[in-house]
Amino acid sequence: MDKINAVITGVGGYVPEDVLTNEDISKMVDTTDEWIMTRVGIKERRILKGEGVGLSYMGIRAVKQLLEKTNLNPEEVEVVLTATTTPDHHFPTTSSIIAYHTGCKNAMTFDMQGACAGFLYALETGANYIRSGRYKKVVVVSGDKMTSITDYQDRSTCPLFGDACGAVLLEPTTEEFGVLDTILRTDGVGYPHLIMKSGGSAYPPSHETVDNREHFVYQDGRVVFKYAVSYMADVAAEIAEKNGLTHDDIAWIVPHQANLRIIDATAKRLGVDMDKVMINIQKYGNTSAGTIPICLWEWENQLKKGDNLILAAFGAGFTWGAVYLKWGYDGKKA
């Protein structure tokens, strides 16, 4: 029997219309456009406004677009899985809400939480469903409404985050396309350094936790940067070397968009020019699990069948990883 690979056959995406600029941020906290651009490379970010509007709002729109672009009957979708740190609710799953509103009524659904590396974890999980031979249509949704857990009184974190969500369709192929290799790593030593301290079962919500602003992102920026800048570059180089890929073989690097300096370090480690690196951090900021699928969505019309892509990410946990992806079709962005 021929080996089954899981190939991406379509990409959908959604970014909110409302823009929050560095000038807007500078009116909230003591910072400047120059400082934010120099430190992280972000000019503006998108924010999802509206009461009762969560990640599913963006996920539904990304999936509807994906289904339309791939001419797929939603009732044919067998799995909908969502990678996010900011679900609509602790329960039910955001995937169940997305599946319901997109007509994927025959799909099993579940959520995953891999922080900023969430898309890589979800992509490998979805690919394994395809590789099993039991599933033919798997939708991977990945994104975050980071503004819902961003403290706009904290000058060290509030300039960093935005909202976005992407979705990809995975299907089987016996050709050498798709998710060809994956490396995923975790080191729990990092958990105290990038965390939402309260709201879970360890520290349930209380007046005290709310007063202490413990329901927002906390980050020890220096520690996180030190690990991220080396781990993300190292794992990207490792997967390229493991698969015999030189800088000439790599069509695109698709990095998590957390910090322009980390992206630059990853490109340099691979010996790849920056014009072969997908960068949109200046427009959207760090959308956590949304960054990589939104890059694929924005660059889809530039991708060619057979292009070698290296996806790399680093996030809370610490979690990090890389995926070697051989693109399966010529760009057809709607």
UniProtKB/Swiss-Prot annotation:
Q: What is its EC number?
A: 2.3.1.180
Its annotated compartments are:
Cytoplasm
InterPro entries recorded: ACP_syn_III_C, ACP_syn_III_N, FabH, Thiolase-like
Q: What class of enzyme is it?
A: transferase
Q: Name one GO molecular function term.
A: beta-ketoacyl-acyl-carrier-protein synthase III activity
User: Which pathway does the record list?
Assistant: Lipid metabolism; fatty acid biosynthesis
Subunit details: Homodimer.
Q: Which PANTHER family did the record assign?
A: 3-OXOACYL-[ACYL-CARRIER-PROTEIN] SYNTHASE 3, BETA-KETOACYL-[ACYL-CARRIER-PROTEIN] SYNTHASE III
Report the protein name in the record: Beta-ketoacyl-[acyl-carrier-protein] synthase III
Q: Which source organism does the UniProt entry give?
A: Parabacteroides distasonis (strain ATCC 8503 / DSM 20701 / CIP 104284 / JCM 5825 / NCTC 11152)
